[in-house]
C-alpha cells in the first residue's frame, strides 16, 4: 500500500501468519502485493513491505513468497525487480500458471491488461521460486488444459532446477472442484512423463 502506516499495519498482521507457519511446520507463507496501480509507488511500497516482513520471517526461518496474483505482481519483470532489489534469501516467488491480469476494469470486472506470454512469465519468476501453483480452468477431451500447455510449463519448471512442491488450483466451472483438482493432478503426472 502506498500509505506507510497502512502498509506497516499489514506487515504487523502478516507477522501472525509467519508465527502460525512456524507452529504448523511450514517453510513459507504466500502474500499479495496489492495496494496501488501506480507503478513507481507500487515498486517502493512492495520493496518496503516485503523487506520488513521478510526480515521478521528470516528470524523465524520462514520464506515470504509473492504469487503473481493481479496488478503489478502479474508483471514478472516488475515483480522480479522487487525480489532482486531486496536480495533476501527468504523472499521469493510462487509462480502461478494462470494469474496474469495486470489491470481489471472496475465496472465489468474483466481483465483489460494481461501479461501475454505466460511461459516467459514463469521462466522469469522461476529463479526465485520456492513453490509453484499449477492453475487450471478447463480441460479438453484428452484431459489437457485448454489455455495452458502443461508440458511446456513443467519443462520450464524442471529446467529452472526447481524440485519442490507444485500445488494445484482448479478455477474452472465445467466440473466440480474435487474433479478439477484430480484432473489437474492427472494432467501434471501425464505431462511430467513427456518432459526432456
Sequence positions of predicted segments:
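Structural motif corresponding to the early beta-alpha repeats
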Residues: 1-48, 58-63, 99, 104-106, ...
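Flexible, glycine- and charge-enriched loops at secondary-structure boundaries
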Residues: 3, 7, 11, 39-43, ...
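A structural motif
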Residues: 21, 26, 129, 162-163
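Non-catalytic positions within long, well-ordered alpha-helices that form the structural scaffold/packing
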Residues: 22, 84, 158-159
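Helix C-cap/helix->beta junction micro-motif
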Residues: 24, 59-60, 89, 160-162
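Acidic/histidine-rich catalytic cores of soluble enzymes
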Residues: 47-155
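Active-site clefts of carbohydrate-active enzymes
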Residues: 129-142, 163-177
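C-terminal helical cap(s) of enzyme catalytic domains, especially alpha/beta-barrels
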Residues: 177-196
Amino acid at each position: 500500500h502506498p500509505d506507510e502506516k497502512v502498509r506497516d499495519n499489514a506487515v504487523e498482521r502478516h507477522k501472525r501468519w509467519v508465527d502460525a507457519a512456524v507452529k504448523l511446520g511450514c517453510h513459507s507463507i504466500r502474500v499479495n502485493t496489492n495496494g496501488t496501480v501506480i507503478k513507481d509507488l507500487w515498486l517502493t511500497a512492495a520493496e518496503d513491505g516485503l523487506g520488513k516482513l521478510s526480515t521478521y520471517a528470516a528470524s523465524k526461518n520462514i520464506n515470504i513468497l509473492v504469487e503473481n496474483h493481479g496488478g503489478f505482481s502479474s508483471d514478472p519483470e516488475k515483480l522480479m525487480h522487487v525480489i532482486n532489489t531486496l536480495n533476501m534469501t527468504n523472499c521469493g516467488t510462487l509462480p502461478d500458471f494462470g494469474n496474469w491480469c495486470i489491470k481489471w476494469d472496475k465496472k465489468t470486472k474483466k481483465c483489460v491488461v494481461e501479461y501475454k506470454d505466460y511461459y516467459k512469465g514463469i521462466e522469469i519468476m522461476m529463479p526465485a521460486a520456492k513453490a509453484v501453483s499449477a492453475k487450471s480452468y478447463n480441460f479438453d477431451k484428452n484431459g489437457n488444459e485448454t489455455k495452458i500447455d502443461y508440458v511446456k510449463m513443467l519443462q520450464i519448471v524442471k529446467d529452472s532446477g526447481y524440485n519442490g512442491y507444485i500445488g494445484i488450483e482448479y478455477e474452472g466451472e465445467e466440473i466440480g472442484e474435487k474433479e478439477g483438482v484430480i484432473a489437474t493432478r492427472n494432467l501434471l503426472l501425464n505431462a511430467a512423463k513427456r518432459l526432456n
